[in-house]
């Protein structure tokens, strides 16, 4: 373990839920405009996660008014108010960059079924 890893451990957040590529998430982001602050919700599916520790990021994509919008969020950033997992997706890849070229029904992600036990 490096010296910086022990320093970074102090800044890691512990309120981040488990989510993976293909999951639909709502990211509540704190937006500060002048003197006012508000929370903006960005809902989309996770295209991938990369990095580790403080430097870990994830990419969320949504289609807004027919135009694809992607945002990259640092997982442990203080501008993120909270992350909600809406649905779990069933995908076979760690990075879903191929979804950029899909439109309509081809862009759907199967929902992971709960175990029937």
Swiss-Prot record:
GO annotation, cellular component aspect: cytosolic large ribosomal subunit
PROSITE patterns xref list: RIBOSOMAL_L19 (PS01015)
Record-linked InterPro entries: Ribosomal_bL19, Ribosomal_bL19_CS, Ribosomal_bL19_sf, Translation_prot_SH3-like_sf
Keywords: Ribonucleoprotein, Ribosomal protein
GO annotation (BP), single: translation
The organism's place on the tree of life at top rank: Bacteria
Gene Ontology terms for molecular function: structural constituent of ribosome
Pfam family, one: Ribosomal_L19
NCBIfam families, per database record: rplS_bact
PANTHER family given in the database record: LARGE RIBOSOMAL SUBUNIT PROTEIN BL19M, RIBOSOMAL PROTEIN L19
Function in brief: This protein is located at the 30S-50S ribosomal subunit interface and may play a role in the structure and function of the aminoacyl-tRNA binding site.
Family: Belongs to the bacterial ribosomal protein bL19 family.
Protein name: Large ribosomal subunit protein bL19
């Amino acid at each position: 373990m490096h010296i910086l890893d022990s320093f970074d451990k102090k800044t890691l957040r512990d309120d981040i839920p488990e989510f993976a590529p293909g999951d639909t998430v709502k990211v509540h982001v704190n937006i500060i405009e002048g003197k006012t602050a508000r929370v903006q919700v960005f809902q989309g599916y996770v295209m991938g996660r990369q990095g580790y520790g403080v430097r870990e990021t994830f990419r969320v994509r949504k289609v807004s008014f027919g135009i694809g919008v992607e945002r990259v969020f640092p997982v442990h950033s203080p501008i993120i108010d909270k992350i909600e997992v809406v649905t779990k997706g069933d995908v076979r890849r760690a990075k879903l960059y191929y979804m950029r070229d899909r439109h309509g029904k081809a862009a759907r992600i199967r929902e992971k079924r709960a175990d029937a036990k």
